[in-house]
Amino acid sequence: MVSHPIWAEIDLSAIKNNIKEIRRITNPKSQVMAVVKANAYGHGSVEVSKICLENGADRLAVARSTEALELRDAGITCPILVFGYVTEEEILKMVENDITLTVYSLEIANSIQKIAEKLGKHSKIHIKVDTGMSRLGFLPEKSSVETIKKIRELENIEVEGIYTHFADADNSDKTYTTMQFSKFTSFLHDLEENGIDIPIKHASNSAAIIDHPETHLNMVRPGIILYGLYPSELVHKERINLQPAMSLKVLVTHVKDVPENTKISYGCTFETKKQSKIASLPIGYADGFTRMLRNGNVLIHGLRVPVVGRICMDQCMIDVTSIENVNVGDVVTVFGKDGTEKISIEEFGNKLGTINYELVCMVSARVPRIYLH
């Protein structure tokens, strides 16, 4: 029995399949760091983390300190890497909870050292190298080698890992990724020439895991592929069998017959051309169903029907004139499968000119996640 008028179904067996597929195509000597930032790309970080760790992931990664603490509070004890910037106040909590931090300046390292020393603890860090993303990271040059030397000398810091991030690995042209990886491996060589051998080396994001096995090193960082979605249409999708984990569903809340020339929703931008049957749905842009999808479709009784009129904050309307026996309480699939028909995240993305990553992250926190085991 459905207890919510709107919900996101998260198929944990799909995530289990995906992590096993990632493990299958990854160098068996490489660790798998499951990326569960942004509430596991909207899927629910705690549940997803647990299923990943039970099925082949060795550790986790998040973007922010609050995300790491949520996992610790849920009883997850494995290593967790924070990719992003943390304030001095946050560093204290990270060190206390044995959470690994990303370092891309001597100043950050000194802050961690000061706090770790005060707490009488050792803090593990990973060095970030900017090989072409032009975001966070040391540039792969001689001065950076000297800085990393200084960081390694800090008594309460353990330099456990070093990594870079690819900017264009999901493209069919592999030139830029090859260049980035070459810069990274050359920098690793320069470090080793200076007596700095950092144990964990990682570069592969989802696209590189699929298309660039030479970049797997001794750890990979799957993100979007954990959730059954491909990084782009340009990667070699045939190499890995992914199953989408999220479906978004709602219940019909009202059905009415309206005459020809009835205006629907804000702005009166839609007008019926004949007598029509209109159903209301309890989903709107506050749930992640953006107003830009007003010309989209949903599924009911295994068939497509159009969204009509502007999408409201909490509701929208659909035209079910072509469907028999539509009743309050019927299930409507916003994306996912209904019988033999489906609406994919990618279809939404094409309508909006955006990517699948953004769309699953858009499903707001007020939408309950229902986990299917």
From Swiss-Prot:
Its cofactor is pyridoxal 5'-phosphate. The modification N6-(pyridoxal phosphate)lysine is found at K37. Pathway: Amino-acid biosynthesis; D-alanine biosynthesis; D-alanine from L-alanine: step 1/1. It is an enzyme of class 5 (isomerase). The active site is at K37 (proton acceptor), Y266 (proton acceptor). Disruption phenotype: No growth on D-alanine, however able to grow on L-alanine. Slower than wild-type growth on a mix of alanine isomers. GO terms for biological process: D-alanine biosynthetic process. It catalyses: L-alanine = D-alanine. Substrate binds at R135, M313. One of its GO terms (molecular function) is pyridoxal phosphate binding. Keywords: Isomerase, Pyridoxal phosphate. Its EC number is 5.1.1.1. The keyword Isomerase applies. One of its GO terms (cellular component) is cytosol. Belongs to the alanine racemase family. Catalyzes the interconversion of L-alanine and D-alanine. This organism is able to use both L- and D-alanine as a nitrogen source. May also prevent D-alanine from interfering with the use of L-alanine. This is Alanine racemase. It comes from Methanococcus maripaludis (strain DSM 14266 / JCM 13030 / NBRC 101832 / S2 / LL). The gene is alr.
